[in-house]
Amino acid sequence: KSKNIIKDETINKIKVRSQKVIDLPPKDLRKLVDIGKKELGEGIIIVFAIKDGKIGLAVGVTDKLTNKYDAVKFVKTGSEIVGGKGGGGRSDFAQAGGIEENKIDDAFNKLKSLI
């Protein structure tokens, strides 16, 4: 079973990276988002990390897209689906948590539908 699953796609002309990582501490999420931003150049990065039964969610939006997309809105929506609350950050990077691992795919689908 892979511990790091990355899927890059284009949704409505915007590059989107969905990433799910097993055994990653939530504090390392920002690093993955930064790498994703560099590799995509421009786009939206959605990362879920699972460690010790807890879920971390981080969303990054590259600078040119922050006038249209807000990372905070994405993490609030995503964390509600996985049983978390709130979350916060800035329009270009936001983070939240959750507990329902089996809902991660639902959260990915919902977040992609917002793009």
List PLM regions with ranges.
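Hard-cation-handling environments
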Residues: 1-14
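Glycine-rich, acidic loop segments that terminate in or are immediately followed by a histidine
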Residues: 14-115
